[in-house]
C-alpha cells in the first residue's frame, strides 16, 4: 500500500513522530513546528498502516475550533468519513460520556450544563439562603473555590479543613451548591470532568469497555492539562492503551487556572519506556526571531530542552523602542503600522500584544485618532468591559438621575438587598405614572409603599448617589471618578474576585481613572461640564464598535490570547519590570518562569518583524510610575536587537532632553519646551507637536492635570 502521501510533505522529525511504532510517545513540539500536521498524519497513519479502526481512536484538544479543524483535515487527508472516532475537548468528550451513561453517573437523562454566569447566580442565591454576608463570602470567590476543588478531584467530604472556620464555611457552601445542582439536574464545566472520572472509578465495567475501545489516545497541548484531566487520561489508558501526547513545556502559560506543566514529566514517569521526539524546525519565524526566543527561554530551569531553528532567512533585527510615556509608545506603534500599510501590508497582518487588558485603552485611542480600524481578539474594547460599564453607569446616574439604563445597571451592583420583586414594583410604577425609575423610587418611598428592608436599601442607594453628586461636584474629574469607584463599592466587590480575572478588573478601573485624568475637551464639548464631556467621549468610543469581521483591521490582544496565532508584524508593548513581568509574578515566588514562557510565546508569534517597546514613565492605574526596562529585554542577544533612535521631530519631555538640544518649532508658532497657560488646565510645558497649520496638535504636560493633547487652533494658549 502506497502511504508516501502521509510522509512526503514532512521533515525528518515529523516523519519519525508520524511513523513511530504504536507505543507511548511524547512529541515535544516547539512553536511553529507543525504539530497539528503531525497529529493529523499520525491518526491517518494509524488507520492506513497500523490498520487501527477509527472506532479505537480518541483525540483530545483544548478548543472546539481545534477539534473541528482536526476533523476537517483528517477527512481531507483520508478522503472518507471517519465515523466512530472521538475528537473533541476534554469537556466535550466527558459530556458525551455522561450522556451515554447518565443513569450510572446518577444524572437525569435531560441534565443541563450550567455556564459560569448561571453558576454565579445560583451561588448568590445559596449564599443568601445560608444567611451568609455576601461581602464576607463573595459568590465569585465561592465559584473559584468550588471549581478549584473539582479540578483537583475533590468532593466536599474529601476536603480537610483542620478546624479552620473559613475552610469549613466554604466546604458547606460547596456541599449546598452540589446538592442544589443534583436536585435540579445541573452540571457545571468542572463537574463534567470530575463526574466522568468518578463514573469510571465507580463502574469498572464501563471503564473496561472504553479501555478496550480506545486503544489509541492522542492529546494536544498537554502542558495545559490540570490534575483531573491528567488523571482522566491516565485512568483511561490503563496498562495497555497507547498514548501520544503533544506539548511544549516552554509554552505552559496557564498555571493561574490550574494547568500543570509538570504533567509532561509525570507522563514520562507514569508511562515507562515512552519515547521523546523533538520538533525543532520552525516554519513561522525568521532566524533572528528564533535566536531571540531560544536565548530568552534558556533562562528558565528544569526544561525538557529544545532549540528552534529555521532554514529560512535571518530576517530583520528585532526593533526596540524606548518611549518617554505610554502615549508616545502608542503613537510610535500606530506610525509603524501606518508605514507597513503604506508599503502594501494589510492591517490584519499586524498584532499588538500586551500583558494586561488595561493597556489597550491608550492603544485604542491612538488607533481611533488615526482612523485605523482594529479588533480586540478574545476580549472587549475598554469601554465595553463589565467593570468599566458599571463605573460609567454610576457616573451617568450622578450626572443625570433620570438615566434609566444606568439606574438598572447599578441599583443592585454591588448587591445591596434590592431584589427583583422590589424592582418590578418600581418598573410598574414608572410605567403607570410615566415617571423615570428614579422618580418612581422617590414617590414610592414617600408613600411608604415598599416593604421595610427593601425600602431601606433603596433609600440608602438614592442617598449614596445624591451624596456622591453633591460631594464630588467640584472635584477634578479623575478625583471624582476615583471617589465614585471606591464609595460605590465597586472596587471592594472586584477586589473580592479571586485570581487574575479580579486583578484585571481592578486594573481596568484604575485605568479608567487615568483616562479621566488625561481627558481633554474637543471643541464641541467646551460648553459641557467635565463629567458630561467625558461621558460623551466614552459613549462615542464604545459606540464605534469593533471592525467588521471582513474588515482589514489591526489585531489587539493579551499575550495569553495570542497563543496559537501568528502574524507577519508583531508589537509587544509595555516591556517594563512590574508590567511584564507583572508585579504579581515578581511578588509571588515561582511565577517568574511562567512570565518568561509568556514572553517566549509572544516573541514566537512574529513571522517577519518583531518590535518591542517600553516607556520611561507611564501613567498607570491613576498614578505616574517609573519602571526599569523588562529583564526579558536584557536576556535577548545583542546581535538580534536594533534600538530605534528618536528622530528630531519626535520629542521627549524637557527633563529628558540633553542640554543644548535645539527646540523644534512648527508653523503654529509654538515651540517644544515652551511654557504656556491654559484657561482650564493652568500652566504647562509643550512636550510634543504633530500636524501643521490649523490641524496642528500640541501635547502639553500640565502641572497637576497630567499630559493632554490640544488642537492648537482652539486651545487659546498664552505664553508664560
UniProtKB/Swiss-Prot annotation:
Disulfide-linked positions: none
Reaction it catalyzes: Couples ATP hydrolysis with the unwinding of duplex DNA by translocating in the 3'-5' direction; ATP + H2O = ADP + phosphate + H(+)
Record-linked CDD domains: DEXQc_UvrD, SF1_C_UvrD
One of the GO biological process terms: SOS response
Protein name, UniProt field: DNA helicase II
Gene3D superfamilies recorded: 1.10.10.160, P-loop containing nucleotide triphosphate hydrolases, PCRA, domain 4
GO CC, alphabetical: cytosol; DNA helicase complex; single-stranded DNA-dependent ATP-dependent DNA helicase complex
Gene for this chain: uvrD
